Amino acid sequence: MQICQSIHSDHARQLDTAGLRREFLIENIFVSDEYTMTYSHIDRIIVGGILPVEKTVSIGDEVGKQLGVSYFLERRELGVINIGGPGLITVDGQVYEIGNQEALYVGKGAKEVTFNSLESSKPAKFYYNSAPAHTTYPNKKITLAEAAPQTLGDDATSNRRTINKYIVPDVLPTCQLTMGLTKLAPGNLWNTMPCHTHDRRMEVYFYFDMDEETAVFHMMGQAQETRHLLVHNEQAVISPSWSIHSGVGTKRYTFIWGMVGENQVFGDMDHIAVSELR
């Protein structure tokens, strides 16, 4: 388990490139036949990937010990979105087949969660977020058709995109976790510009669908003290509540966003005009 501490905005503005990458970038999400896990002190979110190729992968008892509980989801909820081939997630004996760009929500208290691919030649890639939970809500599979879509932006500003909200109150109840997948329209490169912050929630962006020579310039920091990270395929960025989070790619890309915090109101944002950025 990789642990990322909370960091004050005054500290972050002093960091060089290596320091920013160390504090905010998760470089390695997928490892064959293993799970990865990054624990952030910011709202206690956990971020990672599970890539079952030749064998079943489960999050073991050692994680419970690190979290001070008997098992991973004893006091947590889990959201998973598959960006690879079709796979199976088994939750306490209940099997869910999860295809590409399909999601599964797992409620607090699930004791045994395992992950498999249907074909080792086209393995599933399960990207997940987990947040502390106070009660148990039902497990639920969400297909792309069942997600709540919202199209924003314009071709003229190169930010036309469709936000597919998988794990949000309009689709299913959760304690605090929300997740979705944003697809840019052909010829568009920007996400979330004009940008915003939300003091009530932190967020993690996971970028994918990028070839080796594609990169995203992910903008972060306070509006008057912006910085950037160069993000490559299947890497994630932790965004504190005080930071903007926006990106522009050298080519089109897709990203998954996940939020935890005070509320689940998607539109609760503090918008920032482009003219205010520095």
From Swiss-Prot:
Residue ranges of coiled coil: none
Assigned keywords, A-Z: Isomerase, Metal-binding, Zinc
EC number(s) from the headed UniProt entry: 5.3.1.17
Gene Ontology annotations of biological process type: D-galacturonate catabolic process; D-glucuronate catabolic process; pectin catabolic process
Binding site for Zn(2+): H196, H198, E203, H245
Function: Catalyzes the isomerization of 5-dehydro-4-deoxy-D-glucuronate to 3-deoxy-D-glycero-2,5-hexodiulosonate.
Family (UniProt): Belongs to the KduI family.
Family annotation (PANTHER family): 4-DEOXY-L-THREO-5-HEXOSULOSE-URONATE KETOL-ISOMERASE
Name of the protein in its database record: 4-deoxy-L-threo-5-hexosulose-uronate ketol-isomerase
Organism: Yersinia enterocolitica serotype O:8 / biotype 1B (strain NCTC 13174 / 8081)
Gene giving rise to this polypeptide: kduI
